[in-house]
């Protein structure tokens, strides 16, 4: 048999016996404290990294040139034509 029944588990329900619960009781608070510290450190690193990487100021100093209305219309036409070409190709 691959799994031998443990004397600390009920063989019918596989729940912990009262002896196992008593044996684990002294470590419960320390384990919760350790879990809290681990989750806090991991969460802190995640939040710090997320905030650091999402500073999107790479092009903040690059001025955006004004665009001529005629040029804007031409760009819109090109974009619409590109959308139609992609839609026709995907059909």
Swiss-Prot record:
The UniProt record lists the keyword Phosphoprotein: no
Bilayer disposition of the protein: Single-pass membrane protein
Domain of life: Eukaryota
One of the record's GO cellular component terms: mitochondrial inner membrane
Mitochondrial matrix side of membrane: 1-30
Record text on subunit structure and interactions: Component of 250-400 kDa complexes called cytochrome oxidase assembly intermediates or COA complexes.
Chain's role: Required for assembly of cytochrome c oxidase (complex IV).
Database matches in PANTHER family: CYTOCHROME C OXIDASE ASSEMBLY FACTOR 3 HOMOLOG, MITOCHONDRIAL, CYTOCHROME C OXIDASE ASSEMBLY FACTOR 3, MITOCHONDRIAL
Protein name: Cytochrome c oxidase assembly factor 3, mitochondrial
């Amino acid at each position: 048999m691959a799994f031998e029944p443990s004397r600390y588990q009920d063989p019918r329900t596989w729940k912990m016996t009262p002896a196992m619960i008593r044996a684990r009781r002294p470590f419960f608070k320390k384990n919760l404290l350790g879990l809290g510290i681990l989750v806090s450190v991991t969460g802190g690193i995640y939040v710090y990294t997320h905030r650091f990487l999402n500073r999107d100021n790479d092009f903040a100093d690059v001025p955006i040139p004004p665009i001529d209305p005629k040029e804007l219309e031409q760009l819109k036409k090109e974009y619409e034509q590109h959308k139609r070409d992609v839609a026709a190709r995907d059909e």
